[in-house]
Amino acid sequence: MQIFVKTLTGKTITLEVESSDTIDNVKAKIQDKEGIPPDQQRLIFAGKQLEDGRTLADYNIQKESTLHLVLRLRGGTMIKVKTLTGKEIEIDIEPTDTIDRIKERVEEKEGIPPVQQRLIYAGKQLADDKTAKDYNIEGGSVLHLVLALRGGFGLL
């Protein structure tokens, strides 16, 4: 099937894809056509950033759908959030993002509602209304995710 990818310059690229293709595959096809490395590509559909390991079918992207390509500038900051199971989630943030926004990004990737998340960095629990910059969170920083169970006391 054909899909379209629209760049910020307004250029539209046509790609031949299968619904079983992963977002990684799509980024590789964009690289073949446009020479943009996949790690600099962010694909958006229906207002959501598409995750590399997922397929077009996962996002209900059908023939003649239009994806939007945004370039990740070097200034975008990649951090990791480590869960209690040891799983590491990579998240692309801006220094001005609030902790609440980072929790929303965790929810997008893992399905955990922000109200159940406690993020810890440098031994401190992070307040929702503060920014990454307030806590000196920068590229490569690792935050720890602890789940807050309803009704119980969260003892760390």
From Swiss-Prot:
Span of domain Ubiquitin-like: 1-76, 77-152
SUPFAM superfamilies: Ubiquitin-like
Protein name (Swiss-Prot/TrEMBL): Ubiquitin-NEDD8-like protein RUB1
One GO location term (cellular component): plasma membrane
BP terms from Gene Ontology: ethylene biosynthetic process; protein neddylation; response to auxin
Source organism superkingdom: Eukaryota
UniProt xrefs under Gene3D superfamilies: Phosphatidylinositol 3-kinase Catalytic Subunit, Chain A, domain 1
Propeptide: 153-156
GO molecular function, one term: mRNA binding
